[in-house]
Amino acid sequence: MKVPLGLWKVSRGNLWSTQKRVLTMSRCLNSDAGNEAKTVREGPAFSADLYMHPEKWKGLPPQRILELYWERMARLGSEYKPNKDELNALLTTSEYSNVPVNDIKKLYHRGEQGAIDIKGGNVNRDNSLRPFMFDELPSQAQELVAQHREQRFYNRLAAYELPLLAQYRQEYKRPSPESHPVTYRYTSYVGEEHPNSRKVVLSVKTKELGLEEKSLHKFRILARSRYDHTTDIFKMSSDKFEHASQNARYLHDILQRLLAESKDLTEDDFSDVPLDTRHTIAKSLRKKKRDYEFPEHWKRPEDAPKKKFDIVDQLLSTL
């Protein structure tokens, strides 16, 4: 809890600074003691020993009560003892200092310990030196030693255990397009999460699906713009679901439904519907062609820079 003015957080460690402040204030109070018409501050005048009479504090301004409280603590020093009248006067400053009454009681009776309890801190302080752990090196050097130890651990793995994996070698055999015609492409970002990592792209050549001619034509008609007639590749993608495996399963189900619909020629085989290639043509037109040929009549070999004397060729010819 934040205590305004810092009046409740003074401990015995900084009591000397409080005493100096109170003594300075007392000098100001007693500087014009012979002149009864003058006072140290605006308002009614107070007796110099008012701090010794807590029973007279009640009814004074809250700021004045707090000043008298600290003055009494500083002047009495080790002879200071809590007083019931003093506590009752301090409780009247609750609204001014924005500190609850119960917290004022804790601070009054327990001091710094009460302030720590109010804040919810740990009062058990262990200021003793830690036992010697045979770590004669400083912390930075200990980290370097730990890194070196870790590197040696992996070096031992590479030297003694990795060669044992040679007995599990298997020759790589590329899957046959006849048995595995469909390709699923995944995108992974190592060490980070990315929304694009859930996207899966399915691609397959329609001739490798093993369909009859009429079923193959119907499949291409149903595929619409997802079929490229120049490469004979059917492609579709999905990032509808959260995980890539879910999107791959979704694409697999869509492909199976397309195949089942293509093989069903009972209702309509779309034999009278031509293949739509407009999307493929538009895609090829959007591509930038860079296979330009330099015209022959633009070439001017007579304007080419003349070859300078090459000393290396001259030396090689003389040998």
Curated annotation (Swiss-Prot):
Q: What keywords are annotated for this sequence in UniProt? A: Mitochondrion, Ribonucleoprotein, Ribosomal protein, Transit peptide
Task: Kindly give any further remark recorded in the entry.
Answer: Present with 3150 molecules/cell in log phase SD medium.
Disulfide pairs here are none
UniProt name for this protein: Small ribosomal subunit protein mS35
Q: Which InterPro entries match?
A: Ribosomal_mS35, Ribosomal_mS35_mit, Ribosomal_mS35_mt
Q: Transit peptide, first to last residue?
A: 1-30
Explain the purpose of this protein: Component of the mitochondrial ribosome (mitoribosome), a dedicated translation machinery responsible for the synthesis of mitochondrial genome-encoded proteins, including at least some of the essential transmembrane subunits of the mitochondrial respiratory chain. The mitoribosomes are attached to the mitochondrial inner membrane and translation products are cotranslationally integrated into the membrane.
GO MF terms listed in the record are: structural constituent of ribosome
Q: Name one GO cellular component term.
A: mitochondrial small ribosomal subunit
What organism is this sequence from?
Saccharomyces cerevisiae (strain ATCC 204508 / S288c)
Q: Name one GO biological process term.
A: mitochondrial translation
